[in-house]
Amino acid sequence: MLGRLKDQLNMTLAQGQEEAKNRRRQFQEEDQLRRNNKSSNKLSQNEEDAKNMDSVVQKLNELQNNVVAFQKLLQEKTPLSSIQDLEGFREFMENLEHRYEMTVSEVRRLSHEVNDLQTDRENLKHQFEDQIEKLNSEISNQNSLILQKKDELEKSIQRCSELEEKINSLESAQSIEQEVISSLKDDKTVETKNDVPEVSRPSTDTIGVSSALSKKKKKRNRKNQKKKSTKQNIEATTENDALSESISTPDIQKVAQSEDVDAEQDTVADSKEEERRDIANDDLIVNANAKEPMHHFSFTDLDTLLNWPKYVFHHHKIHLADTIPLVFLDLKPKEYTVDLETPKLVEELTKQLHVAESTLKENSEKFKQNSESLKSRVDNLNDYITKLQNEIDECRRNLLWAESSCETIREENQKNIKKLNDAESLKSRLLQSRTQMQTELDSYITSNSQLKDEITSLKQTVSESEAERKRLFSSAQEKQLQMKETVNKLTSLQEQNNEFDRQLKEQEEDLQNKEEELTELRKLLREQTQDSQKLRLLVEQLELERQDLKQAGENHYSNLSSDYETQIKSLESSLTNSQAECVSFQEKINELNSQIDELKLKLNEANKKYQELAISFENSNVKTQSVEPDNGLSLEALKNENQTLLKNLEDSTARYEHLQKSFKNVFNQLRKQQPSNHGRNSSVSRSSSSVEVNSKHPGSDDMLIDKEYTRNILFQFLEQRDRRPEIVNLLSILLDLSEEQKQKLLSVKY
């Protein structure tokens, strides 16, 4: 772009310089002709015309500068190559409006999407909070359930231990009962073997001890029976049902059963202590009775002795050790009376013993069944404990799963929070980019309005300049016609001057001939005195004619010399003015070069900023694609815009190449036209000084143009590495390089 701007600036400057030179030459020639043809009164008008022309030239230069500046702006800010490309400018403005509408719609869409993201974020927050609250409540419930299960396990373990203790106590009681039964059998067999029917009264010591012990035991048994009477009659029938229901019933029945178990534990402990005491007392009583014979024993109290197993084995918790001391303590000593029906009584006793044995067997079988049922219940309790342990394991697993799910939910929540933060940052970035785009759009709109105003003003100025150009062109054509007429007049005057010179030479030759004739005539006068007067008259006339001719030639020569001197002075003044203008143009060119360098720096900075913006825009596009996959349409639109921009770049490069070729052709034409202008300038003036000045001046301009062109090409050569062969070809054309020199330039590394 900068090389193209430089080439176009050089083209415009060269054309402006050439037009200024031609116009100045025309004006100088016209001024000279007017000065030669008109009188001194018209000199002021010529000066005013010259001033007007200078003002017109200044206005044209200002317009040209404005046009060049506007063209620079267009070439920098737009893909347009020149001001004349109105269709391209219209397309550019339409593209700008279309892009503005697209950006506005995109910004609106992004704002709507950001709002949707905010609403989604809030909804997700509420959902996650609800889920977290639910999970916390579930965790608390599960913790409470786990604590309840732990309490139930502990209670069940305690119950199992208590049941094991009860089973052990029952087994010990059963063993004790069997021992007591065996001892009773032994006593009865001894009694049957004894033939002596009399029963002696026990001693007073043993009776006193037994009566005291019986009183104490009665009191204890009454207290225990009052406590246990309500439970013992029910426990035997309902224990199996209670234990089976305790496995399936809820936690309330388990608590009640635990209370029953505690009460049973207390009763078992009390019964154990009482058993120990009763066993000790029974041992004393049995020992006392064993020492003394049973002579005073009444068989009327045997009913109680025979019926006690039924009461004992009615429930498995009432032991024989509790009932046997009562039987022996309730025996009252009676007087011995001999009865003849003792064998019958013995038979009845034996029958009752057999019945008691059968009842004992039945009770033992029932006890075994109860023990087996208790074992089965213990097994069921163990199974229930294993089930509870499995449930606890499942609860723990559920807890672990809930904790892991809570952790995953927390991680997902953190990820969602990060995503939301990223979305917020993206939203802020998009808002910033939106504000930046809005500011850029506002600046573009203002610049567009300014450009439109400038375009309208420039159109007006261009129309005015075109009108002035047409007027100046018409005046220039008229002046060219006048100049042609003046040139024709000059040629005719030159021919007349030549004819006058030739006539002067002829007259001088005639004068010399006439002087010779005079000498001859004087000789003849001497010889012939008669014709002397006539000859004198003729000589005087010839001298007068010669003097007149001399004066006329001198006057004509002086007039021509003065005219030529004035023309030379005017040409010298125009040369000085043109040199000053060339200096000013050179200064302007230097200023333009400095401005071009500054614009290069600005353009590089703008390119860097554009690259950074493009990178940030690509990152934002990637983020928007990751957050919102529905932005395919905007990406396709951007891709289409990029394709259109690439097409515009290709078109601009093609235009640049076309302009470069046209510049070459114009530059070659200028080179060809410069020698003809040089010959024309040399034909107008004959003086050697004017010819030398006119021949040196265009050459210096050509050198300046060549230097600027080569400088620009070298800058391009240093900047653009991709197009190095084209620039080498241009340098070879300009500098007349050989192929070896071309290869050297191409092989040089920068």
Curated annotation (Swiss-Prot):
Coiled coil: 28-182, 213-243, 344-665
Compositional bias (Low complexity): 676-693
Region Disordered, residue ranges: 14-53, 188-280, 672-703
Segments forming domain GRIP: 700-748
Origin: domain of life: Eukaryota
Localization of this protein: Cytoplasm
Keywords associated with the record: Coiled coil, Cytoplasm
GO cellular component: cytoplasm; cytosol; Golgi apparatus
GO BP terms: Golgi to plasma membrane protein transport; intracellular protein transport
Organism of origin: Schizosaccharomyces pombe (strain 972 / ATCC 24843)
Compositionally biased tracts (Basic residues): 214-230
Compositionally skewed regions (Basic and acidic residues) per UniProt: 18-34, 188-198, 269-280, 694-703
Compositional bias segments (type: Polar residues): 201-213, 233-251
InterPro entries recorded: GRIP_dom
The protein, known as: GRIP and coiled-coil domain-containing protein C27D7.02c
